Every structure is written in structure tokens, then in C-alpha cells.
Amino acid sequence: MRLVQLSRHSIAFPSPEGALREPNGLLALGGDLSPARLLMAYQRGIFPWFSPGDPILWWSPDPRAVLWPESLHISRSMKRFHKRSPYRVTMNYAFGQVIEGCASDREEGTWITRGVVEAYHRLHELGHAHSIEVWREDELVGGMYGVAQGTLFCGESMFSRMENASKTALLVFCDEFIRHGGKLIDCQVLNDHTASLGACEIPRRDYLNYLNQMRLGRLPNNFWVPRCLFSPQE
């Protein structure tokens, strides 16, 4: 196994099965963040992740972290909070603000550079990247964004500036996603936070099989239309 250098003149990727074991899932470097290349990557179960100043690195880890939406873990305290939630939740109202929030609300630094923000904003304008926003009155207090692949949603990042804001985004999105035929959320790599929400690890080959099936599925044509998903009780 060896790390592949991508060409700027081709959007082709090597097979994910050729990814390194250490660091887990590192497959290739280089290329660019053009919409065509990003979409090709997601269609093959590959995603970019790299530090500022480093070359673009492309990953497909084994195992893969996923969340079955119906398995979302909601604690008793979160259920009580959501029942009296002060938040309003929308979809695709403020993609730019959400990705900027994800980029800026990281004490330990972020991989979401200016180039990444611009790249995913282009994907959003093309109808492939989407955001969930959480508002306290007119203030954006949390949210999440990711890339749609049919009935599979590739979650990229989330942020929270008030109590339970990002959890509210995920809870409301999962409910809406399930109701309209959504099947699976890709979490990429398991961490303590995603594990606490019900995410689990599956073999990469299983994830790729699910991806190949689900990316051909269809949600309702109006699913990603900007709209309000949840309003606080009066």
C-alpha cells in the first residue's frame, strides 16, 4: 500500500481498499477541492481532511463511523429539554453562517480553512451540501452541515454556542430525515461525542456497499428546500 498523489488534471481516485492502515484510512494527497472532485470523492466513500498549510489529504477509514437515524440516543435530560426547547430549527437558511460557525468554534483549531469554506459553499450552491440551523430568536446558536448522497447524508461538522444546540440540530434532522426516507448518516470517524449519540463503527466494505445502494435512492424533490423544521411551543 502506498500513498497516491492525485493529478490536478483528473478527478479519479484510487480504490478505498488501498488506503493505509496507519494512519488509518489515508488514501491520497493533492488534487483540489473542485465540486466535481469533491462529489467524486463522496460517491466513492472518500472525504478530505487536512491541517492548514498541509497538502489536501483524502481519507477512507476502516472501520467507518455511522449513525442509523432511528438509533440516535436521546438522554432523558435531552428529551425534557427538547420538550420545552427555546430553539427554532431551519434547513438551508444560512449555510454560510453554519460552516463559518463550525470553522470558528474550535478551541483546538480547525481543518475548515477559507478554501474549504469556499469549496463547500460551491457545493451548497449546486444543491449538494446542506445545513441545519438552530436559532434562539434571531441569533444562530448552533448547527450542522454535510453532503447529501441520495438517502445517505455525509455529516461534516457541527457547532454549539448554547446548551444542547447541536444536539437539537441532529435530533430534529434525524426525525425529518427518517420521515422522508433517509437511511444512514456517515460520521466518518468515531469519537466520544458521536458515540454518545448512538454512532457505531462498521467495516469499510459494508459502508461502501450501503453507499453504493443509498446514493441511488431519492428523497422527495422538495426535501432540501429551505424551510422551518421545528418551532418552540408558544
UniProtKB/Swiss-Prot annotation:
Transmembrane segments: none
Intrachain S-S bonds: none
Record keywords: Acyltransferase, Cytoplasm, Transferase
A single cellular component GO annotation: cytoplasm
InterPro entries: Acyl_CoA_acyltransferase (IPR016181), Leu/Phe-tRNA_Trfase (IPR004616), Leu/Phe-tRNA_Trfase_C (IPR042203), Leu/Phe-tRNA_Trfase_N (IPR042221)
Location relative to the cell: Cytoplasm
Catalysed reactions listed for this entry: N-terminal L-lysyl-[protein] + L-leucyl-tRNA(Leu) = N-terminal L-leucyl-L-lysyl-[protein] + tRNA(Leu) + H(+); N-terminal L-arginyl-[protein] + L-leucyl-tRNA(Leu) = N-terminal L-leucyl-L-arginyl-[protein] + tRNA(Leu) + H(+); L-phenylalanyl-tRNA(Phe) + an N-terminal L-alpha-aminoacyl-[protein] = an N-terminal L-phenylalanyl-L-alpha-aminoacyl-[protein] + tRNA(Phe)
Domain of life: Bacteria
Root EC class: transferase
Pfam families assigned to the protein according to its UniProt record, in alphabetical order: Leu_Phe_trans
EC number of the protein: 2.3.2.6
GO molecular function, one term: leucyl-tRNA--protein transferase activity
Cited Gene3D superfamilies: Leucyl/phenylalanyl-tRNA-protein transferase, C-terminal domain, Leucyl/phenylalanyl-tRNA-protein transferase, N-terminal domain
Protein function: Functions in the N-end rule pathway of protein degradation where it conjugates Leu, Phe and, less efficiently, Met from aminoacyl-tRNAs to the N-termini of proteins containing an N-terminal arginine or lysine.
Family that this chain belongs to: Belongs to the L/F-transferase family.
This protein's name: Leucyl/phenylalanyl-tRNA--protein transferase
Source organism: Escherichia coli O1:K1 / APEC
Lineage of the species this protein comes from: Bacteria, Pseudomonadati, Pseudomonadota, Gammaproteobacteria, Enterobacterales
